[in-house]
A protein has these predicted regions:
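Extracytosolic ligand-binding ectodomains
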Residues: 2-373
């Protein structure tokens, strides 16, 4: 009996040893790992074998910050190629809705030759696009989005932004308000999930730490009924509470309506907006007397050749969104090392570079009526 058991045990041991050397248990181990790790390993292996550093972008061509950042990044990639770097920048520009954008990103994710994704160009798309790219272990490097407070924490976070953090923008706005002796503001903001709502929340929270005796009154409006909300809030708060200024967290398309209501009610309070509204989007109603202040980033250009070619090609100075797109491309090219590339190590390298880069960026407040600080 014992002899038979011993023979059986030895037979199983030898059989297991043979299976081990045939690699059968390797497949079982792989099946037990999480899928993200498998995608990461596959991307690492494929990117290292691919002749070119492949970068993708998906954006809406009518979204000015996104389009400008891609324009800057594209020109930067052309300079890198002319300098001998093997780099390929693939863009998809006709994605106006979330499902289209998500589908285009997923297509890039499953092409494991893609080493990084430059984007997204819209903060409202961030959560869903981050989830997709996180699953497929594709680094998500954005020139023009900020990290929301409510963004879920992940063990392996694949998202990095080169864009200045919200606090930097808000500190500049609050410092400008303090310099103009503003102590009471009416915050008019769109609903949850929008960039304006996120910006307004941080502004309201940080104002209490920066300005003494600072008071905020907040009104959140739904898009379909915004005209009534604008009217009620401006007549009630503008007169009854005597606020010193208004902060508007909406988008450029909504600003003229707000301005017209201010004009109709003869309210000449200064209006501050977020970085989501840029100069060439603004159309002021005729005869407006109030001040409009908007923040702009002063971003240093690291590559003189890029600036020279941009002005020559587009016959104008680049927007800061275009510069951020270019600098993101240059940073990714600098930190990419094919022989040691992994999605995780690449993200860490970009994170460190982003912190250093943001130290060089200054935020200034522009008076739209004069174009001066």
């Amino acid at each position: 009996m014992i002899k038979n058991l011993l023979i059986t045990f030895l037979s199983l041991t030898v059989f297991g040893f043979i299976l081990y050397h045939l690699g059968v248990f390797d497949n079982l181990n792989s099946a037990g790992r999480d899928e993200r790790s498998l995608h990461s390993e596959k991307r690492t292996e494929t990117v290292r074998k691919t002749p070119e550093f492949m970068i993708g972008s998906v954006y809406n061509s009518i979204d000015i910050p996104a389009a400008e950042s891609v324009k800057g990044a594209m020109l930067a990639s052309e300079i890198l190629r002319s300098n001998g770097m093997k780099i390929k920048y693939i863009t998809v520009s006709n994605c106006q809705k979330r499902p289209e954008t998500a589908a285009a990103l997923q297509k890039m994710c499953v092409d494991y030759r893609t080493g990084a994704f430059l984007g997204p160009g819209n903060s409202e798309m961030l959560t869903s696009l981050r989830a997709i790219s996180q699953f497929y272990a594709l680094p998500l490097i954005s020139p023009v989005t900020v990290r929301p407070d409510k963004l879920p924490q992940l063990e392996y976070d694949n998202y990095v932004s080169i864009f200045p953090p919200l606090e930097k923008w808000i500190d500049a706005i609050l410092a400008h308000m303090k310099g103009n002796n503003i102590k009471k503001i009416l915050i008019i903001t769109p609903g949850d999930g929008t960039y304006g709502e996120m910006f307004s929340s941080v502004l309201e929270r940080n104002s209490k730490n920066v300005l003494n005796d600072f008071q905020t009154y907040r009104m959140t409006y739904p898009h379909p009924l915004r005209t009534n909300y604008f009217n009620n809030s401006l007549t009630n708060y503008g007169g009854q509470h005597k606020v010193d200024a208004i902060f508007f967290g909406g988008v450029a398309d909504e600003l003229p309506e707000l301005m017209q209501i201010l004009k109709n009610h003869n309210i000449n309070l200064p209006v501050y907006v977020s970085d989501d509204i840029i100069r060439n989007e603004i159309k002021m109603p005729a005869g407006t007397a109030f001040k409009l202040f908007l923040p702009e980033a002063e971003v240093p250009v690291s590559n003189a050749k890029w600036m020279e070619l941009y002005v020559k090609k587009y016959k104008k100075q680049p927007s800061y969104h275009a510069v951020l797109g270019a600098e993101t491309m240059f940073v990714m090219a600098e930190k990419f090392n094919k022989s040691i590339y992994t999605p995780e190590s690449f993200v860490k390298a970009i994170e460190h570079a982003s912190l250093e880069f943001n130290k060089k960026i200054k935020i200034r407040i522009i008076d739209f009526s004069t174009g001066k600080l």
